[in-house]
Amino acid sequence: MEKRTSYCGELNETHIGQSVILHGWVQKRRDLGGLIFIDLRDREGIVQVVFNPEFSKEALEIADSVRNEFVVTIKGKVHARGEKAINDKLATGKVEVLAEEITILNTSKTPPFYIEDGVNVSDELRLKYRYLDLRRPEMNNIFKMRHTVTRTFRNKLDALGFFDIETPYLTKSTPEGARDYLVPSRVYPGNFYALPQSPQILKQLLMTAGFDKYYQIVRCFRDEDLRGDRQPEFTQIDLETSFLTKEEIQAITEDMLVDVVKEAKNITIEKPFPRMTYKEAMDRFGSDKPDIRFGLELQNVSEVVKDVDFKVFQSAIENGGEVKAINAKAAATNFSRKDLDALGVFVANYGAKGLAWLKIEAGELKGPIAKFFPEDKAAELQAALQAEDGDLLLFAADKADIVAASLGALRNKLGKDLDLINEDELAFLWVTDWPLFEYDEEAGRYVSAHHPFTLPKEEDIPFLETDSSKVMAEAYDIVLNGYEIGGGSLRIYKKEVQESMFRALGFTDESAKEQFGFLMEALEYGTPPHGGIALGLDRIVMILAGRNNLRDTIAFPKTGSAVDPLTNAPGEVSAAQLAELKLETVKKETN
């Protein structure tokens, strides 16, 4: 096979007159009465190849037999296209290759869908024939971007003196929040490894080992319910460092992300990124990962409406809840009564018992609850919400967490529905000052808001076991366009604090030792103050590429039900394999 001289997509006017050898796939073939035109595609793009009997009758005859997705080698000369033949849609549109030779390297069956951008095909079929889906230019470009992003992270961390150190995939199952993927041990029947949800404990042990600055681009595994921005296996940019403050770790993170955006998108991001406390984010946006590209902020109107004779509002306030509102500016005419009823159904998915609303018309409140507002209260409400004619006011009244969840989700929906979001903007945000614990209603106890190795604020350590609700964490999340793209913290590095943390989470000293004894012992050997962050590579690429599903950024992803249509994983294994592992499967009962 002759060596390629150029990629198809690289050819331009500087190559005119040059002889080239190209390898690629036939994107399209057109027979125009004696001339055959082939669009030849490789990973760098498409170029038009012309087969003319005046140049090579033999090449024309072979070209007549090729079909879409045949793999070919073409030798020819680059020519300028005529002015009327220039194709501005192609990067190579000012040139074409006049073919002298063509060799068919392999044929192709007719693909199950056209290999081109914008093709209307189901996700299931795309994933079943993922190797064909990935040939499409838009998919190819996503993985070019992913490579650029990964390379930029590596280069930056290397320049900052971080060591790339691998941690094991076969490790111990420890309670970190989501379910573990378990791997049975053949050598020790009845015992299991776990695939890591993160390298959290191991990277902390690398700080105990004195490596000072560690990073890893690492695959992680979580057996959890899936959604558009989650996959059972995903990739993190994972880093840990000793003797630095959280502000210094955040500065390193900002430097990396600024470089990544510049390399991947040629956009300059200003530093430092804006900051917001967890409390402020929940109060203003109803979310711990707010999209700050648009307004529609939540406003607390409990004081304004507490004396209004509307039982829904009164009951919520009397029971320790609150009433908050969103002012959708100039949106009153966008929503019919039917549309507003649909919004009520939407917020019910987040626990809200309903959605009250008002419209402002000619300076007056209009809507089902307008009758409960006397003139003075109506004026006070409009002033509090800066409401004007044409505005739509939307209210939720309940416990604070339900109000936040329902109005936060509604805010995001309205931002899209009202076209308030600049899709070209990249809005980074730090969310800081997190509570160390959050209350789990189902479990009836406090659990870690992040993970059980997060350092409490020093002044709150005495309250770990006595008043968990007031303990704050040295934790920080990085948010981009409403997605959490990373989370980090300073870590507990003293044994007595870690023991107290485990007790606060309901571990007995014995169970803590059984699960984490190796970590507890390491903390007795001079573990330094340390901290770090983990950034979601797949999610960062998803946002930068303008996609809305992680599947598009992972070469061979799973479906929403954790199935791989390409390989049909997960699948059954043989009885012999199970016997070797001393395992039996439980058969489902059939009615």
Curated annotation (Swiss-Prot):
It is an enzyme of class 6 (ligase). One of its GO terms (biological process) is aspartyl-tRNA aminoacylation. GO terms for molecular function: aspartate-tRNA ligase activity; ATP binding; catalytic activity, acting on a protein; nucleic acid binding; transferase activity. Its main location: cytoplasm. It is found in: Cytoplasm. It comes from the Bacteria. Keywords: Aminoacyl-tRNA synthetase, ATP-binding, Cytoplasm, Ligase, Nucleotide-binding, Protein biosynthesis. The keyword Phosphoprotein does not apply. It catalyses: tRNA(Asp) + L-aspartate + ATP = L-aspartyl-tRNA(Asp) + AMP + diphosphate. CDD domains: AspRS_core, EcAspRS_like_N. GO terms for cellular component: cytoplasm. It holds the Pfam family GAD. InterPro entries: Aa-tRNA-synt_II (IPR004364), aa-tRNA-synth_II (IPR006195), aa-tRNA-synth_II/BPL/LPL (IPR045864), Asp-tRNA-ligase_1 (IPR004524), Asp-tRNA-ligase_1_N (IPR047089), Asp/Asn-tRNA-synth_IIb (IPR002312), AspRS_core (IPR047090), GAD-like_sf (IPR004115). ATP binds at R222, D223, E224, Q231, E484, G536, L537, D538, R539. NCBIfam families: aspS_bact (TIGR00459), PRK00476.1 (NF001750). HAMAP family: Asp_tRNA_synth_type1 (MF_00044). Belongs to the class-II aminoacyl-tRNA synthetase family. Type 1 subfamily. Catalyzes the attachment of L-aspartate to tRNA(Asp) in a two-step reaction: L-aspartate is first activated by ATP to form Asp-AMP and then transferred to the acceptor end of tRNA(Asp). Homodimer. This is Aspartate--tRNA ligase. It comes from Listeria innocua serovar 6a (strain ATCC BAA-680 / CLIP 11262).
